[in-house]
Amino acid sequence: MFDIKDGKLKISVRTLVEFICKSGNIDNRFKGVTDKNAMDAGSKAHRRIQKSMGPDYRAEVPFKFTVPGENYDIEIEGRADGIFENDGYVTIDEIKGTYRDIRYITEPVYVHEAQAMCYAYFYSARENVDDMKIRLTYVSLDTADVKYFEEIMSAARLKEWFDGIITELRRWGDYLYTHHNERDKSIEGLKFPFDYRPGQRELAVNVYRAVSRGVNLFIQAPTGVGKTISTVFPAVMSIGKGISDKIFYLTAKTITRTAAQDAFAVLRNEGLDFKTVTITAKDKVCFLESETGPECNPAACPYAKGHNDRVNEAVYDIITHENVIDRVKVEEYAHKHNVCPFEFSLDISYWMDGVICD
């Protein structure tokens, strides 16, 4: 999702608000066009709206805003869809294409509104403007009909709101800053935990070289050679050197998943501070029994209803209390916070050092 490098936490406006301000249900009942088709149609709608606004309308206005901090600065970047004068107010326009019938959109989606509020705050802070107007422009991708929502906001209100967003973001940034420092220190003194078997050192060296160079490495070796630890160890070392950010270990069988978990456990016994999550298939981890598979919607599943209202707290709870997050831990915390265990595990993976995929 984001990382801290060279004393900076860099994040886009969209990622910021979609993370901090997300809410609502999981709902897989509404499936239509492919993501690419929707993106293409949305881009065309954006350009059409922007061109229709006249010569004084500035489209795709870039912003970069930095919030200094003690251990790291937060650098936020993005592009406002449009800026124009409206009834004497500088107005930030946020355009959203939708396949919903816009007649039934009675208020703006908070995440969309939050994007506009970020840009409004950036503008008011830079230009010393007392009051700003934000406009949410919803355009139907089927009919091209348009619906507007407008609101005037004071600079003081925008600042108070934005400060709250940054306070929440820093909670997560501080977690990363502290954990990554502790993890990297633990990697510095890490040694290979066994005496090398024939060919094992060569394997580990070649894995490290492949990771360092960003190339693929294909290995064929018999069972019992020690392939798992010989691949996990150099991958961990690459994280300590800043070459890699995260390890993904893909497994097809339970025994290989267990081998990966055991390899990380061995390194933890040697002093490694390293967080891992095991992702279990949705149909295995779903709390509801269904002959047709998981029904991920608020009408059928209480864990889907309001999932996005609760999942951030659930994630923060588990990542700050657990280093080894397996299926049992995922289910335990999912029950505690009343969230979908599968989607919960995916969100956890953003904050882990290693991800073991079932």
Language-model features: locations:
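Metal-dependent nuclease catalytic cores that hydrolyze phosphodiester bonds in DNA/RNA
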Residues: 1-89, 110, 114
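A substrate-engagement module of RecA-like helicase motors
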Residues: 184, 243-355
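Conserved pre-motif I regulatory segment
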Residues: 177-220
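Walker A/P-loop
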Residues: 212-234, 246
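Polybasic (Lys/Arg-rich)
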Residues: 157-189
